[in-house]
Amino acid sequence: MIGDVTFFNRWFGFIVFRSPALKKNLYFKQIPYETISEYSLGRYALEKQGFTISAIVLDGRPGVRKVFSDIPIQMCHFHQKQIVRRYLTNKPKLEAGVELKEIVSYLCTGNKEDFTQRLDKWYEKWESFLKERTIDKATGHWFYTHGRLRSAYRSLRTNLSYLFTYLEYPELNIPNTTNSLDGSFKNLKELVGIHRGFNSTLKKKIIEEILSN
């Protein structure tokens, strides 16, 4: 199962649960903002209908994993790469950033042991660099000089336990990305964009009709 949320404007979004095996959206609901409770309600609704969620692919939103803590959880590789890219940019200037970006490029082709070893070696090499501090002359307070690099590394370390779940349970055929749902979201937004002049009620009907097919 893949669970994700997309927004069409600040307060107009949809949470969707999709079965890659069935190639079908099994649950969707309009929401004003993304919350943990909406994921919980979605799971409850599906199980009430008789569906069994054997595993879930998520984008890494904090707290959502608790809703699915009793089943295998896969962190979407695409979203993990996006997180790192957001901190490092596409062209990191620091050598440490370039090397970390290179490690992330092995995410989809490696395994947990190999990836962990690469990450551990990188940290061992750059540990002192990551701990460098800068003093704010105006306030006298210090901050980590390479805060964005630290955040990129920390995201990988935090999500490591969920990045290779799909290899640990081959019998479940778990995708390693939310791409099948993201592709639907992209097409949906393009279609809704064509009908920009429609009011929210009509847009909602169009979106629900598309998601149900």
Where are these regions (language model features)?
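Acidic/histidine-rich catalytic cores and adjacent linkers
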Residues: 51-62, 68, 102-213
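Glycine-rich loops and low-complexity Gly/Arg-rich segments
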Residues: 25-29, 39-43, 51-55, 80-83, ...
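Conserved beta-strand -> loop -> alpha-helix junction used to position metal-binding or nucleic-acid-contacting
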Residues: 55-101
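A short hydrophobic/aromatic micro-motif that marks alpha-helical segments and, especially, helix-coil
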Residues: 19, 34, 94, 195-197
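RNase H-like nuclease fold core
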Residues: 1-62, 66, 159, 180
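Short, surface-exposed beta-strand-loop junctions and turns on beta-sheet-rich folds
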Residues: 22, 72-74, 194
